[in-house]
Amino acid sequence: MSHRKFEHPRHGSLGFLPRKRANRHRGKVKAFPKDDQTKPCKFTAFMGYKAGMTHIVREVEKPGSKLHKKETCEAVTIIETPAMVVVGVVAYVKTPRGLRSLNTVWAQHLSEEVRRRFYKNWAKSKKKAFTGYAKQYDSEDGKKGIQAQLEKMKKYATVIRVLAHTQIRKMKGLKQKKAHMMEIQINGGTIAQKVDFAYSFFEKQIPIEAVFQKDEMIDIIGVTKGKGYEGVVTRWGVTRLPRKTHRGLRKVACIGAWHPARVSYTVARAGQNGYHHRTELNKKIYRLGKVGTEAHTAMTEYDRTEKDVTPMGGFPHYGIVKDDYLMIKGCCVGPKKRVVTLRQSLLTQTSRLALEEIKLKFIDTASIFGHGRFQTSLEKMRFYNRVTK
C-alpha cells in the first residue's frame, strides 16, 4: 500500500451504474426544455448521423484575455442531418404519476422506410401497416373522427409532441433501410396552437435550421462505441498489481471482507464496457451546412479555396457528406454512422463561451486516412505536375 498513507480515492464513477448494454440503438430524450407559451411554436430536437471529425482554425473573441484576436486550432465533429419528416402527433396529460398518453393521430401517407420500423422482418411481412388507418382519410366520417381526436387534444392535453422520422434513404453511406423515429416536443404557444402547428407539418419536412441556429449550445444524446467484455483495469481504471503478483496482475487484489459474505456493488469487476447510453451537454454549433449554399462547402471568408467539407477520399468508414450537416465543437458519442439525437439545451446559457460568435478561418479537408498534406485533389495534381494544360 505504498503512497496510500492518508487517502485513497476510488477508481471509476458509480454514477453510471449499471454498466450494461443500452436497450436501444438510438439516444432517448428523457427531458425536453421548459415550455414558454409566450414564444412562438418551435421544435426542440432533431436526429443526425455521425460522419467523422476534422479540425478548424478560428480567431478567439475574448476581450481581456491573452488569447483575444489570436488564432486557435480546435477539433470538430461533422454530423449529417437530412430533413426529418413529420408523420404524427401525440398528446400527453399530466397526472400525479407523471405524463400519460392521451391519444395519437397519424398522417395519411407513410413512406416505406418508416413502415419498416414496425416490422422485425420486412421481406417476410405482409406490409399492411397503416393501410387500414389511412382509409379514414378517404371518407367523411373518418375525417370527422380525426378532427375529433385533434379537438380532444386541444381540450385535455398539456404536452404536444410530433412523431418524426429520418430520411435514411438519403444516407448513401448507410446500408440500413429502416428509418429512425422519435417524438419531438413542441414548445411555445397555447395547446391549440401547438396542435395546429403539428398538424400543418404532416407529411412535410423539417430542415435542421428550423430547430437550431449557428453559435447555439446543444445537447447530444446517443450510445457510445461498444467495447465488449473488458477487465477491471480497462473498465474501471484500477491500478495494476506488482509484477511478481501470483495468478495475474490486472485484477482487484481484494474484493471485500469475509463479512458481509457477498461482494459489494461498489467493487470494480470485469464486464461489459461501451455501448452505454450517454448525454453530453453544451456542444457549440460552429456551422450549419445547407445543401446548395456556400455554407455546405469548406470555404470561409479567409480561405476562398473551392472545396467541399468532406475530406479527400471521404470520411473513413462513412463516405461523402451530401446533405445538410452540423459542425460542432469537440467530439460526440458513438462510432461513424451512429444515429445521434440533438436537443436544445435545458439551461439558459449566460457564459461568455456560450455567447461568443464563431468566425472560422480555415477548415481542414486533407485526407484523414493517412498523413494528408493536400487540401484538394487539384492542389495534389499541381504538386506532382499532373495538371493538364
Curated annotation (Swiss-Prot):
Keywords: Cytoplasm, Ribonucleoprotein, Ribosomal protein. SUPFAM superfamilies: Translation proteins. Gene3D superfamilies: 3.30.1430.10, Ribosomal protein L3, domain 3 (4.10.960.10), Translation factors (2.40.30.10). One of its GO terms (cellular component) is cytosolic large ribosomal subunit. The keyword Ribonucleoprotein applies. It is found in: Cytoplasm. Residues 18-31 have a biased composition (Basic residues). It comes from the Eukaryota. One of its GO terms (molecular function) is structural constituent of ribosome. GO terms for biological process: translation. InterPro entries: L3_arc_euk (IPR045077), Ribosomal_L3_dom_3_arc_sf (IPR044892), Ribosomal_uL3 (IPR000597), Ribosomal_uL3_CS (IPR019926), Transl_B-barrel_sf (IPR009000). Pfam families: Ribosomal_L3. Residues 1-34 are annotated as: Disordered. PROSITE patterns: RIBOSOMAL_L3 (PS00474). Its main location: cytoplasm. Belongs to the universal ribosomal protein uL3 family. This is Large ribosomal subunit protein uL3z. The lineage of its organism: Eukaryota, Viridiplantae, Streptophyta, Embryophyta, Tracheophyta. The gene is ARP1.
